[in-house]
Amino acid sequence: NIKGLRDCLESLPALGICLGHQIIAHIYGGETFKLLFGHRGGNQPVKEIESGRVYPTSQNHGYAVSDKNFPKDLNITHMNINDNTVSGLKHKNKPIISIQYHSEACPGPVDSEYIFDNFIELIKEKEWIVKEGF
C-alpha cells in the first residue's frame, strides 16, 4: 500500500522502475496522466538532462508522470524525447531515484547500466538499518 511505501521511503533508499517511478512521484505529491499513445517497445529515446546524452530505452506503459505541479522535493533527471514526458526523477535530499523505462532490459550492451551504478553509489554513502516491521 502507498502508506507502507511512504514509510519505507522515510528511512530506506529506493530505485523505482516503470510503475515504481509513478508511485514514487505520487508519494511526493506528483500526478500521472494517461498518454494519448502508450510508450511501447525498445526504441524510446530518453535524454538524461545532466549530461544531455540520449539513450534508447525499452518501455511498456500507458501513463506518465506529469511535469505540471511537479513535487518540490524531486528533480526531473530524464525526459522522453518523443513527447517530453518525465522519464526519470531524483529526490533532492534522499537516496531515491526512479526511471519510467526498463533499464534492466538494456536495448544496447550497457546503455542504461549507469542507472544501477548511480543507485549503488547512493546507497554506499551511509550504513542502512532496516527497522523491525519492514
Language-model features: where?
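Cysteine-nucleophile active-site neighborhood
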Residues: 1-56, 64, 109-118, 122
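Active-site donor-binding loop signature of nucleotide-sugar glycosyltransferases
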Residues: 37, 48, 81, 91, ...
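Active-site glycine-centered loops adjacent to acidic/histidine catalytic or metal-binding residues
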Residues: 18, 61, 102
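Acidic/polar loop patches that form or flank catalytic/metal-binding clefts of enzymes
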Residues: 33-35, 128-133
